[in-house]
Each structure stands twice: as C-alpha cells, then as structure tokens.
C-alpha cells in the first residue's frame, strides 16, 4: 500500500496497552519507516515489541522473589511493486523472537526464534461516477506469517506460527473536494490446523472363551486402553505448509465449524480535507472460537506533516474480555508531502 502513498517517506510509532483492567505493564509498541523509492516501488522496515511486564516468581516461602520479563519481538523489511496503475503486490520478510521462558524455573528453556513471510496484493481504483455518486473501489488480500514452526527447547513441542489469510474491500464515497466517507469489510482465517477431538480405545476380548466379551484388565485391575487416538478431526502433527491447506477442512464439527473459524470486521471513516477523520468499526468472532466481539471508535488529526490517531475499544461480547476499554495511540511524521499525486 505504501506504493500508493502521496508522501515520499514517513516514520510512525504506535503504542497499545493491554489488559489494563488487570495490570499496568503489558503493552505493544511498533516503529515503522517507509520510503517510496519512485513511481513504481516502495520499501518499509518495522520493529514490533510486545512486553508481558514483570512476573514475580516465588518458589517457596523461604526463597527470595525472582523477577522475569517475558517478551516477544519481530523485525520486518518489506518491498512493494506497482504492477499496474491501480494494482500492486508486496512481500515482507520477518524475523520473530519469542522469549517466554521462565529461567528460574526451567534453566534449560531458551528463547525461540523463527522467520516468516507475508505476501500481499492491493487494488486502488480510479475515481469513477456511479450514477449520482462519485467513488473509488479498493480491495486487498494478504497471507501473513508463512514460515516454519517455532519451539522453545530441543525436546519441546513445535508450535505453528499464527499464519493468517485476510481479504478485504472498501468503497470511498467522494462527496466533494473536501469530504469523503469510506466503508470497508474484511474477513480473516487462521491458517493452522484445528486441534482434533481425542479419545481412547479399550480392549474387550473373550478371555475364557465362553462366548462373552470380558474387559481387558491389567495387573493393577484397570481397563487396558490405547494411547489417545483421534475421535474427530485430523492430526495436527503436520508441517506448516500442509497445515495451511488442512486448515480449510479439518474442523471436527465439519463444514459448519469451518465457517465459524472465519472472523469478520466492518469499518467506516469520515475524512475532511485529509486533515481530520472520525472512525468506527466492529469485529466479530464466533462464540465457539473465542467469542471476541469489539466495537471501536477513533479519530485522526493531521497538521503540517504530522498525523495523530487515537482509538478506543469496547467489548460487545457476553463473555468479559480483558482487552475491553483499550486505548490505542499512533503518531506518524510525513516527509515530502504531496510529492506524488494519485488522484
């Protein structure tokens, strides 16, 4: 999307506190720099840091408390190329480091690291007349975090990266030279295997050959059973590429459950002269898959190459969420404004 920017380059930072109803030291910070190299290409670099705050570890009543500071970090570099006047594609390379170890409890644990790739496409149409309305169509798609599994120790279980497929579209109502109303819609699918439902198989045999099946009993007098076996669904013990394709058909509840694994979101924005904006949005997730439902209100201001954006999150779910009442803040500095004219 940077390749459609009217600004030559820019630097942005954002800060989001999390779980403010419970603690005050968990937060997500992000730094981004982008540069539109020419009419056809742009690049960006970013750093994202998620702090889980301080965790106090007390092993027993006689030990001194130890402080651990788990965190996660990603570093990205991306490049986008304009393949046509209204269409571009991009690729991003990402390094991920997850340090969730509790060294005072497990000295053998270590920080885990991996890499991921994002592939994206974006379309931004020209201004057109649709009957009584002047408008512009926008659409995009992205696959995020394509990469190998991650694990925290040599003998530990490997974990999938949160690979996501996001597809969205929008329409800009160009009311006049100064006023624009935009509406957007987006769907998201997590591209990792759904955990299967497990069960056990028990052994019943005709031990004394009297024509009646007897319970298989071991030396402790307990029923003999197998290790857990898949009762419904498919095995999640696959590589990350197989997991992507499997994620569309492996829900234990069948197709109806697959549909519940899609989240969707709607958004609207009013913008005046590219200097002031009001925003509202809604996010929905099935109650069987996390029950996240949020309303968001936001505003943006731009003055002399500096943009400030604020948003506030409200929970709309019946299930209380620790993410509700979250305030998000971002600040962007543009350099070389209006160097490129797109409309």
Say what each PLM segment does:
Residues 1-343:
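Subset of outer-membrane beta-barrel
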């Amino acid at each position: 999307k940077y390749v459609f920017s009217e600004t030559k380059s820019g630097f942005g930072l954002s800060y989001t506190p999390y779980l403010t109803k419970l603690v005050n030291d968990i937060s997500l910070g992000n730094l981004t720099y982008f540069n539109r190299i020419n009419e056809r290409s742009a690049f960006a670099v970013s750093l994202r840091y998620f702090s889980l705050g301080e965790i106090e570890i007390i092993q027993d009543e006689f030990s001194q408390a130890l402080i651990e500071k788990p965190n996660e970090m990603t570093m990205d570099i991306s490049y986008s190329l304009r393949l046509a006047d209204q269409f571009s594609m991009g690729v991003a390379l990402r390094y991920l480091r997850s340090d969730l170890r509790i060294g005072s409890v497990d000295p053998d644990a270590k920080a885990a690291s991996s890499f991921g790739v994002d592939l994206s496409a974006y379309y931004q149409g020209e201004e057109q007349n649709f009957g009584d309305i002047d408008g512009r169509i926008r659409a995009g798609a992205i696959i995020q975090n394509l990469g190998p599994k991650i694990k925290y120790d040599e003998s530990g279980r490997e974990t999938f990266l949160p690979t996501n497929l996001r597809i969205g579209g929008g329409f800009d109502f160009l009311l006049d030279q100064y006023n624009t109303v935009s509406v957007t819609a987006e769907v998201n699918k997590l591209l990792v295997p759904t955990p299967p439902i497990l069960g056990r198989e028990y052994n019943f045999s005709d031990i004394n050959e009297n024509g009646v099946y007897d319970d298989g009993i071991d030396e402790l007098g307990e029923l003999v059973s197998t290790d857990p076996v898949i009762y419904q669904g498919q095995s999640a013990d696959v590589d990350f590429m197989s997991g992507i394709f499997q994620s569309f058909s492996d829900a234990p509840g069948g197709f109806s459950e697959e549909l519940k694994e899609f989240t969707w979101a709607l958004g609207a924005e009013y913008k005046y002269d590219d200097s002031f904006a009001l925003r509202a949005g809604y996010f929905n997730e099935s109650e069987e898959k996390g029950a996240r439902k949020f309303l968001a209100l936001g505003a943006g201001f731009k003055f002399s190459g500096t943009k400030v954006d604020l948003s506030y999150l409200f929970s709309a779910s019946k299930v209380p969420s620790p993410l509700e009442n979250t305030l998000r803040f971002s600040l962007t500095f543009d350099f070389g404004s209006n160097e490129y004219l797109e409309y």
